[in-house]
Amino acid sequence: MQPASLAGISCTIFENLLKDYTHELTQTVHKNAKLSLQKCPACNKHCRQYCTKPGYDIYGNSVQTPSNVPYYSCLMCKREIAASRYAAHLEKCKGRSLSNATSYSTLFEDDNADEED
């Protein structure tokens, strides 16, 4: 059966590409699933299996949840801040963010220029 129009040809090409891609993807997933069940010939362990323990990622590393993220007390306002946000908070808390420092220095330079004239 020959497609009569450009749309028919395009649809046929797309269907063939999609079928080939889907077939290749399912074969790859099936192969990886089968290999993950076998023991590794080098170390005689299940190296390819994913960790399924709760609280761990797929590699077996502990996942930090909000309850076990370390918190530090701010030196200025004494609030508890997460370790990942501490530097940014301290910078804002002291009022020395880059934008503020730049604007203050330009204002200071402008004032000095006016006094010299």
UniProtKB/Swiss-Prot annotation:
A zinc finger (SGF11-type) spans 72-93. Component of the transcription coactivator SAGA complex. SAGA acts as a general cofactor required for essentially all RNA polymerase II transcription. At the promoters, SAGA is required for transcription pre-initiation complex (PIC) recruitment. It influences RNA polymerase II transcriptional activity through different activities such as TBP interaction (via core/TAF module) and promoter selectivity, interaction with transcription activators (via Tra1/SPT module), and chromatin modification through histone acetylation (via HAT module) and deubiquitination (via DUB module). Zn(2+) binds at C74, C77, H89, C93. It comes from Schizosaccharomyces pombe (strain 972 / ATCC 24843). One of its GO terms (cellular component) is DUBm complex. Belongs to the SGF11 family. HAMAP family: Sgf11. This is SAGA complex subunit Sgf11. The long N-terminal helix forms part of the 'assembly lobe' of the SAGA deubiquitination module. Its main location: nucleus. It is found in: Nucleus. Component of the 1.8 MDa SAGA (Spt-Ada-Gcn5 acetyltransferase) complex, which is composed of 19 subunits tra1, spt7, taf5, ngg1/ada3, sgf73, spt20, spt8, taf12, taf6, hfi1/ada1, ubp8, gcn5, ada2, spt3, sgf29, taf10, taf9, sgf11 and sus1. It holds the Pfam family Sgf11. Signal peptide: none annotated. GO terms for molecular function: transcription coactivator activity; zinc ion binding. InterPro entries: SAGA_su_Sgf11, SGF11. Keywords: Activator, Chromatin regulator, Metal-binding, Nucleus, Transcription, Transcription regulation, Zinc, Zinc-finger. GO terms for biological process: regulation of transcription by RNA polymerase II; transcription initiation-coupled chromatin remodeling.
